[in-house]
């Protein structure tokens, strides 16, 4: 069985590599036509999509999937609407492919600059949410990449139905079906094959739980764009507007508990902790948030004692750790030690503090007087995102269309020869 899965994935990889050469040179109009046609196909296939999703939901219930997983799995009419809107939005985004910048003349007379080009073949591994199939396919297509999509086994019927719509859209734009391929097998060996085919796959983007991302990072022979955790902090400094800080901290935690940009630890300067924490804690309790705190926090409000593990934990739930710190130095030290380099915020009106925080906090996004919940490609003006990277090579932060491309140097001459004036 493993051999047949390997052969199957090799066929997908070979087809994707060939298709990448076609989509890489496709015009913006042709790519946009495929996106718009896919949106129309989804709209026409609502009944088929709902029926396929109902089968996945029934199987999920029978297999004991947790309610939260079932909720992410559901393709509601509103989510189908959102997929359609998303495709049309991506069609409206500027095409990064072929953009040329930094052209300059060198003393030799040649011109040197950079051109933005697709990465090639992008492998995407994700869990549960079938709408990711459309998000990923649309961004890869618009950025001129072929893609191989390996969704979770629990969404296999939904993903197949969505793939049929994508295939119709590609056909209408006269693009190869292999530009977007959805892995049909639920065998987990497919993941192992996908992440070890550097001859066919240029980059892997895993989207899912920590176990999946750790496995991909450990075993891949292909570059990986990923983040492991979203352990995000908000630091309320001694120079903060406390009313503003309370609103920011509340939004950072409660906007959505399950997003990777949700605040997991609140750091409060000792100078203002007694004035700030009682009202802040009352607001969180009213919302049903469980509070855990350090010893200095517990001297001020009644909370569960925080352990060392709490500072390392991405809760993705209505739980918040609170730590009172001596000042900016301790706040930065805590964030850089315990954080996941995702998104961290300071609330302060002191400009030198703000500049230090922005420069010294080692995270892919640093917020000033704004909640970490803003860590999102759409909010950043990228239109959409394939994921958020906490790595430092190639892409960092929300990865949109430009993050799915790279640059090559272009050199233009008129017969100049090296070594000759």
Curated annotation (Swiss-Prot):
InterPro entries: Ald_DH/histidinol_DH, Ald_DH_C, Ald_DH_N, Aldehyde_DH_dom, G-glutamylP_reductase_CS, Glu-5-SA_DH, GPR_dom. One of its GO terms (cellular component) is cytoplasm. It is found in: Cytoplasm. Its main location: cytoplasm. GO terms for biological process: L-proline biosynthetic process. One of its GO terms (molecular function) is glutamate-5-semialdehyde dehydrogenase activity. NCBIfam families: PRK00197.1 (NF001221), proA (TIGR00407). This is Gamma-glutamyl phosphate reductase. The gene is proA.
């Amino acid at each position: 069985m493993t051999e047949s899965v390997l052969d199957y994935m090799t066929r997908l990889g070979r087809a994707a590599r060939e298709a990448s050469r076609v989509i890489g040179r496709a015009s913006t109009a042709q790519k946009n036509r495929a996106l718009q046609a896919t949106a129309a196909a989804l709209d026409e296939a609502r009944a088929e999509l709902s029926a396929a999703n109902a089968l996945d939901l029934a199987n999920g219930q029978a297999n004991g999937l947790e309610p939260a997983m079932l909720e992410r799995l559901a393709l509601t009419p509103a989510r189908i609407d959102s997929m359609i809107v998303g495709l049309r939005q991506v069609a409206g985004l500027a095409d990064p492919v072929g953009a040329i910048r930094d052209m300059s003349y060198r003393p030799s007379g040649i011109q040197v600059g950079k051109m933005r080009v697709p990465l090639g073949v992008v492998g995407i591994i994700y869990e549960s949410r079938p709408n990711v199939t459309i998000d990923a396919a649309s961004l890869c297509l618009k950025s001129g990449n072929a893609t191989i999509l390996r969704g979770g086994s629990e969404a296999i019927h939904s993903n197949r139905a969505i793939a049929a719509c994508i295939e119709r859209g590609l056909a209408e734009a006269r693009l190869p079906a292999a530009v977007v391929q959805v892995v049909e097998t639920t065998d987990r060996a497919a993941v192992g094959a996908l992440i070890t085919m550097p001859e066919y796959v240029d980059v892997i983007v895993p989207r899912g739980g920590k176990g999946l991302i750790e496995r991909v990072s450990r075993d891949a022979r292909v570059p990986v764009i990923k983040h492991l955790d979203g352990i995000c902090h908000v630091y309320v400094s001694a120079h903060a507007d406390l009313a503003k800080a309370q609103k920011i901290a509340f939004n950072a935690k409660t906007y959505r508990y399950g997003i990777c940009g949700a605040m997991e630890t609140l750091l409060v300067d000792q100078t203002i902790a007694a004035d700030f924490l009682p009202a802040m804690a009352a607001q969180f309790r009213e919302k049903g948030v469980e509070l855990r705190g350090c010893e200095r926090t517990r001297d001020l409000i009644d909370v569960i004692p925080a352990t060392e593990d709490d500072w390392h934990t991405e809760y993705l739930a209505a739980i918040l750790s609170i730590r009172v710190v001596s000042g900016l130095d301790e706040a930065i030290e805590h964030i850089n030690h315990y954080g996941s380099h995702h998104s961290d915020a300071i609330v302060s009106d002191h400009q030198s503090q703000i500049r230090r925080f922005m420069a010294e906090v080692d995270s892919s996004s640093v917020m000033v007087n704004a909640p970490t919940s803003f860590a999102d490609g759409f909010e950043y003006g990228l239109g959409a995102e394939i994921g958020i990277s906490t790595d430092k090579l190639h892409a960092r932060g929300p990865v949109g269309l430009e993050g799915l491309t790279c640059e090559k140097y272009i050199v233009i001459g008129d017969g100049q020869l090296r070594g000759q004036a």
